[in-house]
A protein has these predicted regions:
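Outer-membrane beta-barrel transmembrane domain signature
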Residues: 95-115
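Single-residue signature of alpha-solenoid repeat helices
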Residues: 17, 21-24, 68, 107, ...
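Short coil/turn linker motifs that delimit alpha-helical repeat modules in TPR/alpha-solenoid proteins
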Residues: 35, 57-64, 78, 100-103, ...
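TPR-repeat structural position
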Residues: 11-14, 65, 104, 141
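Terminal, low-structured helical/coil segments at or just beyond the last alpha-helical repeat
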Residues: 126-130, 134-192
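Boundary/linker segments of alpha-helical solenoid repeat arrays
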Residues: 28, 83-84, 115-124, 153-166
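Alpha-helical junction/boundary sensor with strong preference for TPR arrays
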Residues: 25-28, 32-35, 72, 79, ...
Length: 192
Protein backbone atom coordinates (compact mmCIF):
# COMPACT_ATOMS: atom_id res chain seq x y z
CA UNK A 1 0.00 0.00 0.00
CA UNK A 2 1.04 3.62 -0.41
CA UNK A 3 1.06 4.16 3.36
CA UNK A 4 3.39 1.22 3.91
CA UNK A 5 5.66 2.56 1.17
CA UNK A 6 5.67 6.02 2.70
CA UNK A 7 6.42 4.73 6.20
CA UNK A 8 9.02 2.08 5.42
CA UNK A 9 11.82 4.20 6.86
CA UNK A 10 13.88 4.27 3.66
CA UNK A 11 14.92 7.92 3.36
CA UNK A 12 16.38 7.33 -0.12
CA UNK A 13 12.80 7.43 -1.35
CA UNK A 14 12.29 10.82 0.26
CA UNK A 15 11.73 12.76 -2.95
CA UNK A 16 8.97 10.41 -4.14
CA UNK A 17 7.37 10.28 -0.69
CA UNK A 18 7.46 14.05 -0.40
CA UNK A 19 5.82 14.36 -3.82
CA UNK A 20 3.06 11.86 -2.93
CA UNK A 21 2.32 13.69 0.31
CA UNK A 22 2.45 17.09 -1.40
CA UNK A 23 -0.08 15.95 -4.01
CA UNK A 24 -2.34 14.63 -1.28
CA UNK A 25 -2.08 17.91 0.63
CA UNK A 26 -3.14 19.84 -2.47
CA UNK A 27 -6.17 17.56 -2.88
CA UNK A 28 -7.13 18.05 0.75
CA UNK A 29 -6.72 21.82 0.57
CA UNK A 30 -8.88 21.93 -2.57
CA UNK A 31 -11.52 19.75 -0.90
CA UNK A 32 -11.56 22.01 2.18
CA UNK A 33 -11.98 25.11 0.00
CA UNK A 34 -15.02 23.60 -1.73
CA UNK A 35 -16.74 21.77 1.15
CA UNK A 36 -17.84 22.41 4.68
CA UNK A 37 -16.04 19.94 6.90
CA UNK A 38 -17.36 18.96 10.32
CA UNK A 39 -15.56 15.72 10.99
CA UNK A 40 -12.88 15.37 13.67
CA UNK A 41 -11.11 12.51 11.90
CA UNK A 42 -10.85 14.54 8.69
CA UNK A 43 -8.98 17.31 10.51
CA UNK A 44 -6.74 14.76 12.24
CA UNK A 45 -5.92 13.18 8.88
CA UNK A 46 -5.17 16.57 7.35
CA UNK A 47 -2.88 17.37 10.29
CA UNK A 48 -1.16 13.97 10.06
CA UNK A 49 -0.48 14.30 6.34
CA UNK A 50 0.80 17.84 6.86
CA UNK A 51 3.10 16.58 9.63
CA UNK A 52 4.47 13.82 7.42
CA UNK A 53 4.91 16.21 4.50
CA UNK A 54 6.88 18.71 6.52
CA UNK A 55 9.16 15.95 7.82
CA UNK A 56 11.37 16.15 4.75
CA UNK A 57 12.86 19.63 5.00
CA UNK A 58 13.44 22.42 7.48
CA UNK A 59 11.79 24.80 5.00
CA UNK A 60 8.58 22.77 5.10
CA UNK A 61 8.70 22.69 8.89
CA UNK A 62 8.91 26.48 8.95
CA UNK A 63 6.13 26.83 6.37
CA UNK A 64 3.67 24.22 7.67
CA UNK A 65 4.63 23.61 11.31
CA UNK A 66 2.23 26.10 12.83
CA UNK A 67 -0.66 24.93 10.63
CA UNK A 68 -0.82 21.52 12.29
CA UNK A 69 -1.93 22.53 15.79
CA UNK A 70 -5.07 24.41 14.61
CA UNK A 71 -6.15 21.29 12.69
CA UNK A 72 -5.97 19.14 15.82
CA UNK A 73 -7.72 21.92 17.76
CA UNK A 74 -10.48 21.92 15.13
CA UNK A 75 -10.80 18.14 15.50
CA UNK A 76 -11.13 18.60 19.26
CA UNK A 77 -13.87 21.20 18.75
CA UNK A 78 -15.93 18.47 17.08
CA UNK A 79 -14.91 15.76 19.54
CA UNK A 80 -13.15 17.04 22.68
CA UNK A 81 -12.58 13.49 23.94
CA UNK A 82 -11.02 12.04 20.80
CA UNK A 83 -7.97 10.27 22.18
CA UNK A 84 -6.29 10.17 18.79
CA UNK A 85 -6.44 13.96 18.41
CA UNK A 86 -5.36 14.48 22.03
CA UNK A 87 -2.33 12.22 21.57
CA UNK A 88 -1.30 13.95 18.37
CA UNK A 89 -1.74 17.51 19.59
CA UNK A 90 0.31 16.44 22.61
CA UNK A 91 3.09 15.41 20.24
CA UNK A 92 2.80 18.77 18.48
CA UNK A 93 3.32 20.56 21.81
CA UNK A 94 6.27 18.27 22.56
CA UNK A 95 8.16 18.92 19.33
CA UNK A 96 7.20 22.57 18.74
CA UNK A 97 9.68 25.17 19.96
CA UNK A 98 8.50 27.30 22.87
CA UNK A 99 8.50 30.41 20.70
CA UNK A 100 5.53 29.03 18.71
CA UNK A 101 3.77 27.52 21.71
CA UNK A 102 5.54 24.25 22.40
CA UNK A 103 5.24 23.10 26.00
CA UNK A 104 6.06 19.88 27.84
CA UNK A 105 3.48 20.86 30.48
CA UNK A 106 0.76 20.98 27.80
CA UNK A 107 2.12 17.77 26.31
CA UNK A 108 1.65 16.03 29.65
CA UNK A 109 -1.87 17.41 30.02
CA UNK A 110 -2.90 16.23 26.55
CA UNK A 111 -1.29 12.80 26.97
CA UNK A 112 -3.02 12.31 30.34
CA UNK A 113 -6.39 13.29 28.84
CA UNK A 114 -5.78 11.07 25.79
CA UNK A 115 -5.28 8.14 28.14
CA UNK A 116 -8.43 8.99 30.11
CA UNK A 117 -10.47 9.26 26.91
CA UNK A 118 -9.04 6.20 25.14
CA UNK A 119 -11.83 3.84 24.11
CA UNK A 120 -10.30 1.40 21.64
CA UNK A 121 -7.30 -0.84 22.22
CA UNK A 122 -5.37 1.16 19.62
CA UNK A 123 -6.10 4.43 21.42
CA UNK A 124 -5.11 2.91 24.77
CA UNK A 125 -1.93 1.42 23.28
CA UNK A 126 -0.66 4.70 21.84
CA UNK A 127 -1.83 6.84 24.76
CA UNK A 128 0.06 4.52 27.13
CA UNK A 129 3.19 4.62 24.97
CA UNK A 130 3.35 8.37 24.49
CA UNK A 131 2.56 9.17 28.11
CA UNK A 132 5.14 6.60 29.24
CA UNK A 133 7.83 8.27 27.18
CA UNK A 134 7.18 11.71 28.57
CA UNK A 135 7.27 10.18 32.05
CA UNK A 136 10.56 8.49 31.12
CA UNK A 137 12.02 11.93 30.40
CA UNK A 138 10.69 13.15 33.75
CA UNK A 139 12.46 10.17 35.36
CA UNK A 140 9.17 8.67 36.56
CA UNK A 141 10.42 5.22 35.61
CA UNK A 142 8.00 3.15 37.68
CA UNK A 143 4.91 4.66 36.07
CA UNK A 144 6.63 4.65 32.67
CA UNK A 145 7.27 0.90 32.91
CA UNK A 146 3.75 0.25 34.17
CA UNK A 147 2.29 2.02 31.14
CA UNK A 148 4.59 0.15 28.76
CA UNK A 149 3.48 -3.11 30.38
CA UNK A 150 -0.15 -2.11 29.82
CA UNK A 151 0.64 -1.42 26.16
CA UNK A 152 2.33 -4.84 25.94
CA UNK A 153 -0.79 -6.48 27.32
CA UNK A 154 -2.71 -4.99 24.39
CA UNK A 155 -0.10 -5.94 21.79
CA UNK A 156 2.22 -8.67 23.07
CA UNK A 157 5.52 -9.17 21.23
CA UNK A 158 5.27 -5.75 19.58
CA UNK A 159 8.44 -4.82 17.71
CA UNK A 160 7.57 -1.17 18.29
CA UNK A 161 7.57 -1.69 22.06
CA UNK A 162 10.84 -3.62 21.80
CA UNK A 163 12.36 -0.63 20.00
CA UNK A 164 11.03 1.73 22.69
CA UNK A 165 12.40 -0.42 25.51
CA UNK A 166 15.75 -0.59 23.72
CA UNK A 167 15.83 3.21 23.37
CA UNK A 168 14.92 3.56 27.05
CA UNK A 169 17.77 1.20 28.01
CA UNK A 170 20.09 3.55 26.10
CA UNK A 171 18.75 6.45 28.19
CA UNK A 172 16.54 7.85 25.42
CA UNK A 173 12.81 8.33 25.28
CA UNK A 174 11.03 7.42 22.06
CA UNK A 175 10.83 11.13 21.26
CA UNK A 176 14.55 11.66 21.83
CA UNK A 177 15.36 8.54 19.82
CA UNK A 178 13.23 9.73 16.88
CA UNK A 179 14.71 13.21 17.01
CA UNK A 180 18.24 11.76 17.13
CA UNK A 181 17.71 9.65 14.01
CA UNK A 182 15.74 12.33 12.13
CA UNK A 183 17.23 13.53 8.89
CA UNK A 184 15.69 16.92 9.67
CA UNK A 185 17.99 17.38 12.64
CA UNK A 186 20.96 16.66 10.39
CA UNK A 187 19.66 19.20 7.86
CA UNK A 188 19.04 21.87 10.51
CA UNK A 189 22.58 21.42 11.87
CA UNK A 190 23.92 22.14 8.37
CA UNK A 191 22.05 25.47 8.45
CA UNK A 192 23.47 26.47 11.87
Amino acid sequence: SVLQYIDDGDRSRGKVQHEILGNQLKKIESFVENNQINDAYFFCTQADITSCYMGYSVGDVLKYGTSVRPLYEKALEYNPNLSYALTNIGQWYYFAPGIVGGSKKKTLSYFEKARECAVTDSQKYFADIFLSQLLFEKKEFERCNSLLSEAESICPNSNYLKKIRSANQQGLSLFEYNRKKSSLDKESKKIE
